Each structure stands twice: as C-alpha cells, then as structure tokens.
Amino acid sequence: MTASSRGSSAATASREHIGYENGVLGGVSSAVQALTAPGEKILVHSPTYVGFTHTMADNGRVLVHSPLVRDENGVWRMDYADMDAKLKRHHIHLAILCSPHNPCGRVWERWELERAMEVYAANDCLVISDEIWSDIIMPGHKHIPTQSVSADARERTMAFYAPSKTFSLAGLIGSYHIIYNTYLRDRVVRQSEVSHYNDCNVLSLHALLGAYSPAGEEWADEMCRVIDANHEYACNFIRDNFKGVRVMRPEGTYMLYLDCADWCRKHGVTIRELQERG
C-alpha cells in the first residue's frame, strides 16, 4: 500500500494482521458484538459520528459520551479526567476512538493519543480505532496511527480503515481492519464470518488496489491541498458573515464543525429549531 500506508499502521503489519470488512461501520459492529453483550456501555467522544450512534443502538449497546473540551486556544481536546471517571463509574471495557475525529476535524497529536491509551489501559478498556479519515490530512499535520503509540496500544487496539472517504468509493463497498492481537483478531473475524455478508468482491478489490497506488497517492495529496483551500475560504466566510458562529479550521477530514451556541442564544432559537430551519 502507498496512499494508505502513510496514514495507517499497514507499513508494520503482516498479512495475517489485515482482514477484509465490507465497511468500517460493519467492522466496528462486528467488534462490538464479539467483545460486548447487549446492554453493555461503550465510551465515545462527543460530538459523536451519527453512524456510531445508530449502529450501537441497533446492536443494543449503550453509548456513554465523554465531551471534547476547548482549550485556551479554542482547540478541541479530549478530557482525560472525564474519560477516566466514566470508564470507572460505568464499568466500561470497550471504547470507540475516532482518529482523525469526525465531526470536529481534529488530527490527534501523538501525546494526546499516548495519554488516551494510558487511560484506557489503566481501566482495562479495549479500543476500536476508526481511522477511515487518515488519508485526508491538511498540510502541517500528521496522522498518528493509534496502534503505533505504544506496545500496549498495539495489542489493545483494533483499527479500521477504508479508501471510501478519500477516493469516493463507498458505493463499491470494502474496507479492512488491522488487528495485531491474535485473540482479538480471531474474535472479530469469527463475528464477521457469521454475518454471512462479509465477502470481498472483485470490483472493490481492484478499486482499492488502484487507489493505494503511487498515482492514487499523488491524487490524494492534490485533493488535500484543494480541501485545505476550501477550508480557508469557508472558515473566513463564516467568521465574516455569521457573527456568533464559531468554527475551527479542520486539521483533517473535509468536515466543518460549527459551534452555533452563541448565535442561537442571540437569536432566541434552539439548536433543534436551527436544524429544522436548515
């Protein structure tokens, strides 16, 4: 892999560590079913990708949210004390980490991931790391695979990737996991097999190979530069024309996360009403 290996831990993986999934959400669902029981709680950061919300509800699991917080520079950060408290209070042993984070666009720095993994390890919590956005990284930032930050993280984490976001291949179906821990890998693979849907198709396989070629990497690099310019334009436009709406320029992904709380207070509307007007 070329385009993928710059953003994933594939460069250090052997053949047996990599497995096919029809989609990242499908792989996440298989891991959740393999490692938890209905009614168990799973830790996620909020704001939360709506796909996690729906998938966990469909599987009968309960999400516990640890809200991201802004630092003094307006950068969204994980709240490690809150994570630790909720893992302990709710006896949680499985967490989902979105890296880069959707929807706020954070590309977690190594120290942030190291500290998060220390919290998970201290609470005997396994980690599902959704890294589907790892190739859409803006200039000046670098994706750090969760599994790369420590020996414990390598064994504790199940990482999921796909070319679908980067190369608009979602309609063809196809993603993959990287799981180094043999026990965890066997559990996830077995759960994926019993679903009877997790079979690779030839068209998506060749699309992935084409995407993860030198030409695909060149295309992805150019796309990231275009997205970065679009981010700059959009953020400037929002700040100039929508007073009270806060926006942080994304470090990764093509998502813009708008904080409309001040705007809503000023105009006497709720977030729900604003969504309905949209």
Name what the model sees in each region.
Residues 2, 6-278:
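PLP-dependent class I/II
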